[in-house]
Regions:
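Generic beta-sheet signal
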Residues: 6, 46, 131-142
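Domain-level recognition of soluble alpha/beta enzyme cores
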Residues: 154-181
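Active-site signature of alpha/beta-hydrolase-fold catalytic machinery across serine-
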Residues: 62, 146, 150
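Short, solvent-exposed loop/turn segments at secondary-structure junctions
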Residues: 12-15, 54-55, 74-75, 141-144, ...
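Phosphate-coordination/substrate-recognition cap region in phosphate-metabolizing enzymes
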Residues: 35-95
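Short glycine/proline- and acidic residue-enriched helix-loop micro-motifs
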Residues: 96-116
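A polyampholytic, Gly/Pro-enriched intrinsically disordered region
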Residues: 87-101, 175-189
Length: 189
């Protein structure tokens, strides 16, 4: 059995995030100085993966000149809600929005449900179990949430907030485990 160190990093902030909108394929807003710190911290990764969207590729390029896009790391398919402001949905599709928030099987937007996203991410995590080394994957808040739910086997999907450039670490050595690194960046392995 091989050991894996998987670090999931949320892409840098986008305008859609600042405006509380469902995303489109937009670029990151800027390249914050936090990216330099993260890039240095994870420079020794054996693989750098990212979602296929522009914002994940731009962020991943801080870690590796040629990150490998992985379709399994793509954002949730928001269907007709792509680019829509949450406040507009609260006014115009309040019942649909509430159904989506409260029922992980619901996909009133015509895209992917939280359960479908979770199944996709679970399959991706299972596919990594034959790998070894340190993998950095730059992806989206919902993908990070789904990965956490797989690891902790919980149902608290909507109780997890994933900020831009947040980094969580998952390790596999027979079972997936969530590791919360401390603030001692010099001593972090």
């Amino acid at each position: 059995m091989q050991s894996i160190r998987l670090t999931l990093i949320c892409h840098a902030r986008t305008v859609a995030q600042k405006l509380a909108r469902f995303p489109t394929n937009e670029p990151v807003e800027n390249q914050p100085s936090a990216l330099v710190t993260l890039a240095t911290r994870f420079a020794s990764a054996s693989h750098v993966l990212c979602g296929p969207e522009l914002r994940t590729r731009q962020t991943a390029e801080w870690f590796c000149a040629t990150p490998q896009a992985d379709e399994a790391l793509r954002d949730c398919d928001w269907g007709r809600w792509h680019g829509q402001a949450i406040k507009d949905l609260q006014l115009n599709e309040a019942e649909a929005l509430q159904a989506w928030i409260s029922d992980p099987h619901a996909a009133p937007h015509g895209g992917e449900s939280v359960m479908q996203l979770g199944a996709r991410v679970a399959a991706w995590l299972a596919s990594l179990q034959g790998e070894s080394g340190h993998i950095v994957a730059v992806t989206h808040p919902f993908v990070v949430r789904a990965a956490l739910m797989q690891v902790v086997q919980g149902l608290a999907f909507n109780a997890i907030d994933v900020e831009p450039l947040a980094a969580i670490e998952l390790r596999f050595n027979g079972i997936w485990r969530l590791r919360l690194p401390g603030n001692d960046l010099a001593g972090a392995l």
